[in-house]
Swiss-Prot record:
Gene source species: Fervidobacterium nodosum (strain ATCC 35602 / DSM 5306 / Rt17-B1)
InterPro entries attached to this UniProt entry: AAA+_ATPase (IPR003593), ATPase_AAA_core (IPR003959), Lon_bac (IPR027543), Lon_bac/euk-typ (IPR004815), Lon_lid (IPR054594), Lon_proteolytic (IPR008269), Lon_Prtase (IPR027065), Lon_prtase_N (IPR003111)
Swiss-Prot/TrEMBL keywords: ATP-binding, Cytoplasm, Hydrolase, Nucleotide-binding, Protease, Serine protease, Stress response
CDD domains: RecA-like_Lon
The protein's name: Lon protease
Annotated catalytic residues: S697, K740
One GO-annotated biological process of the protein: protein quality control for misfolded or incompletely synthesized proteins
Assembly behavior: Homohexamer. Organized in a ring with a central cavity.
GO cellular component: cytoplasm
Gene this protein is translated from: lon
Signals that turn on the gene: By heat shock.
Length: 810
């Protein structure tokens, strides 16, 4: 293949030959040399454009056209301009037949070629070897000059005029090319060459043969580009106006500042007011110093500077915090006790603790406020008790929910360097309440999380520590603030999710689930009167409750530790009773039968008490978040080889209790019953298999069931038991005694076996229940078996300590 240096002589005469070819009649051969274009330009018929030729294959095609095809060459675009040595697959199928008008050589050995587009054509196949040489087919179409074509030409011309108004790419005089053109095909090609768009869109226009279709596509492209240019111009205008406005404001502000300086430095009204506020109020000295420093910064800034807004916001915060303002605590202990009892029934321990604090404050103003944590199941009144405490103490009340909190800045605030920085929620509450000694409830403290944004539980360590919160520093405020007079009350459902360091700073008061007796009293004296007070007319003329109806709702329609569901069910009954009263015009007395009518069948499907003593079946007691419940343990022997089968969806701890109970049972029964363990499999099952169960407190119950099934002795059905066991047969204390005793009482079981060390917990059981119960306190499993497996069910145990539940019995 020849190179550029070899062809210097040949191309020196190209310009002369081009001039000669223009004077001759155009004749288009069927086979033409082809130049592959890799610029972003598409040559259309009926247009005159220049382009550059530099590659060897293009120079050879140009030479071929000048010498053999009467200066006619086929120009086709590459699909990818980056391809240096293209093949047929790199080219579009449709190109333009052009006539060479002029060829000029450039200093860099490339040639500038001026051509005139003659016709659009598509190549059939390549017959060249060293360069592209295509068999071509000219693309023609027949059309008449219809009104539609004339309208399209007019619309394209108008749209081009619009485009030229917004774009600087096309000189206005260029549109003169279209003024005298009445041939639609020529008009469409010239318009296409002026039309904006990328290489793909231009190639599509070239491939559209019919002028009407070509004009429609040109119209679409022009309309789109004109709209975009119009939007760009509008945006540019807005930006320009803003810049001019900003410059004008800056000029006027500077001018005003100079005038003020000349007149003797007259202070800004806002700054003057801030200075007066600092001097006229009793702020701590360190607050005044900080405020003065910030005001000095503000004076040196432009009033409209972004930093000035940050300083103003900061000054607003530190000057509006209650540095000294506080409410006076009530010194009437009887009044405080009355308020607490009005709002809540029971809850003696938290009430007593608040009254103790008030009594201490009455004689010593230096008494530190306790950090109280109420722990208990949902709905038992933890949050509402905190509100009552504030009312009883004559303090303002604020609540902050910690559930799901993961960002430390929610407690400590953001540093002022951050955009949109704000103080933490503790300081926000203090400012909102306007006093430095409110009651603040930190709700759901057990449900905080940890994330990459920090650990909010660790941030609370300073807040809830009486030794540190005297000088609590919020990241935004940056000044020490005394939180020691704030009474913090926290609530939680469980303790184990609270970090030990945080738990150690709080005085934990457990609020257990309400008993049925307490629920009845609350429903009768709190819930129903509250509902009645919401009626416009006298509620006692519309409905009334029988005590038996309230008890039916408690026992058969609610199973919860608190009273939220109980209130919902009572409200449902009241709504239906009110509707009946309005329809009939008579007062509705709500009886148990009416409860069934209004609420439907019983929602609580509780298993009945065992009808008679049974072999291998014992009644245990369990604690759940909804209160206490009875738990039946079943065991049986089946032929086998000493295996153990455990069913009932038991957790790992309870499974371990079963294995301990089995080992202990084998030890208790001795060699006399050894064959029963080796020739049988033992199956232990806890009914209600869909409910997960876990914990060690069923140890004595399982052991009793196993000994019963091996010895073939029935277990008394009038006794319930709870307690953890060891391999030595010791009975260890367990939790939830109050709830478990109440569960036995509800079931009609009035004799309960408990660990000896749980005897002190009996005092927590309501006296009305305690006096009706009999408790046997045991230290070993043998004492349990003496009572539970006594063949004479009426015979009292000779071992273990048994007493009636009178609170005075010791």
């Amino acid at each position: 293949m020849p190179n550029k240096n070899d062809n210097k002589g040949k191309y020196s005469r190209l310009e002369k030959e081009a001039k000669k070819a223009r004077e001759e009649k155009i004749s288009i051969p069927n086979v033409l040399p082809a130049i592959a274009m890799r610029s972003n330009m598409v040559i259309f018929p009926n247009t005159v454009v220049p382009f550059y030729v530099g590659r060897e294959i293009s120079l050879m095609a140009l030479e071929e056209a000048m010498e053999k095809t009467n200066q006619i060459v086929f120009v086709v675009n590459q699909k990818d301009p980056a391809v240096e040595t293209p093949t047929e697959k790199d080219l579009y199928k449709v190109g333009t037949i052009v006539r060479i008008i002029q060829v000029g050589k450039l200093p860099d050995e490339t040639f500038k070629v001026l051509v005139e587009g003659i016709a659009r054509a598509k190549w059939i196949k390549n017959v060249g070897e060293k360069f592209f040489k295509f068999e071509i087919e000219i693309l023609r179409t027949r059309y008449g000059k219809s009104k539609r074509l004339i309208a399209l030409m007019r619309m394209v011309k108008e749209e081009l005029h619009k485009y030229v108004q917004y774009s600087r790419k096309i000189p206005p005089e260029t549109l003169m090319l279209l003024e005298d053109v009445d041939n639609p095909d020529v008009f469409a090609d010239i318009a296409a060459s002026l039309c904006p768009g990328n290489i793909e869109e231009k190639q599509q226009l070239l491939e559209i043969v019919h002028p009407a279709n070509r004009l429609e596509r040109i119209l679409d492209i022009l309309a789109r580009e004109t709209e975009l240019l119009e939007i760009e111009q509008q945006l540019d205008q807005k930006v320009k106006e803003r810049i001019e406005k900003s410059q004008r404001e800056y000029y006027l502000r500077e001018k005003l500042r100079v005038i003020r300086d000349e007149l003797g430095g007259e202070e800004d009204i806002e700054i003057k007011e801030l200075k007066e506020k600092i001097e006229n109020n009793n702020y701590p000295e360190f607050v005044k110093e900080k405020a003065r420093a910030e005001i000095n910064r503000l004076e040196k800034m432009s009033p409209y500077a972004p930093e000035a807004t940050v300083v103003r916001t900061y000054l607003d915060w530190i000057l509006n915090l209650p540095w000294h303002e506080k409410t006076d605590d009530t010194d009437d202990i009887n009044f405080a006790e009355k308020v607490l009892n009005e709002d809540h029934y029971g809850l003696d321990e938290p009430k007593r603790r608040i009254l103790e604090y008030l009594a201490t404050r009455k004689v010593s103003q230096k008494a530190k406020a306790p950090i109280i944590c109420f722990v208990g199941p949902p709905g038992v009144g933890k949050t509402s008790l905190a509100k009552s405490i504030a009312r009883a103490m004559n303090r303002k009340f604020g609540r902050m929910s910690l559930g799901g909190l993961r960002d430390e800045a929610e407690i400590r605030g953001h540093r002022r360097t951050y955009v949109g920085a704000m103080p933490g929620r503790i300081m926000q509450l203090i400012r909102k309440l306007g006093v430095k000694n409110p009651v603040i409830l930190l709700d759901e403290i057990d449900k905080m999380g940890i994330s990459f944004q920090g650990d909010p539980a660790s941030a609370l360590l300073e807040v809830l520590d009486p030794e540190q919160n005297k000088e609590f520093v919020d990241h935004y405020i940056e000044l020490p603030y005394d939180l020691s007079e704030v009474l913090f009350v926290t609530t939680a459902n469980v303790l184990y999710t609270i970090p030990p360091a945080l738990r150690d700073r709080m005085e934990v008061i457990e609020i257990s689930s309400y008993t049925d007796v307490e629920k009845f009293y609350i429903a009768k004296n709190y819930i129903i009167p509250k509902i009645e007070s919401e009626f416009v007319e006298k509620a006692d003329e519309i409905f009334s409750f029988k005590d038996t109806a309230i008890k039916k709702i408690i026992n058969e329609y609610t199973l919860e530790p608190g009273v939220r569901e109980l209130e919902r069910e009572i409200r449902s009954v009241v709504r239906k009773a009110t509707l009946d009263a309005i329809k009939t015009g008579k007062k509705i007395v709500i009886s148990p039968e009416k409860v069934t009518e209004y609420l439907g069948p019983s929602k609580i499907k509780d298993e009945d008490k065992l009808e008679k003593p049974m072999i291998g079946v014992t009644t245990g007691l369990a604690w759940t978040p909804n209160g206490g419940t009875t738990l039946y343990i079943e065991s049986t022997l089946i032929p086998g080889n000493g295996g153990l089968i455990i069913t009932g969806q038991l957790g790992d701890v309870m499974k371990e209790s079963v294995r301990i109970a089995l080992s202990l049972a084998r030890k208790i029964v001795g060699d006399e019953y050894a064959e029963k363990f080796t020739k049988n499999d033992i199956h232990v099952h806890v009914p209600e298999g869909a409910v997960p169960k876990d914990g060690p407190s069923a140890g004595v119950t399982i052991t009793t069931a196993l000994v019963s099934v091996v010895k073939n002795i029935p277990v008394r059905n009038d006794i319930a038991m709870t307690g953890e066991i060891t391999l030595r047969g010791r009975v260890l204390p367990v939790g939830g005694i109050k709830e478990k005793v109440m569960a036995a009482y509800r079931k009609g079981i009035y004799h309960v076996i408990l660990p000896k060390k749980n005897e002190v917990d009996i005092e927590k059981v309501p006296e009305v229940v305690r006096t009706k119960m009999k408790f046997t306190f045991v230290e070993t499993i043998e004492e349990v078996l003496e009572v539970a497996l006594n063949e004479d069910n009426s015979k009292e145990s000779r071992k273990g300590r048994t007493r009636k539940g009178n609170s005075n019995t010791k």
